[in-house]
Amino acid sequence: AKHYRMIADRLGELGFDARGFDPLAQGWGPLFKYLDGLPTTVERVAAGQFTREAIAVVKNRQFIEFCDRAGDRLTATLYRDVIEPDERFHHQLGRSLLLKLAATPEAQEAARRASARTLALAEELQGAALRTAGIHHAPGC
């Protein structure tokens, strides 16, 4: 929620009023539905806290580079100094939890499956964003 508010404020500075935007107008997305339906803690941590946050770190770094190239230093700074470090922390937290939770071969396999499915879904969603909206440098938080 903190990042959403910061991004909405930045969009306002750029001339877009995000107050009327409802990110859930189309309902929950496929990745959220997948994460929400995972039955075990190790799967939820592997898919969400570890993998999804790792994706966010990579996508945010790409977005920072895009903003720098486009000359939008303020947005790049917001992502570089606040959002990306938070996402990196979330990913590291997921890693430390996984080291404790994935203590058996079965738990490790469940974590691997959940992580792989998260990566596949993220790739599908990124492909759809490119095909339908031409978006290829979307941030990941």
List each language-model region with its residue ranges.
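Non-heme di-metal
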Residues: 1-141
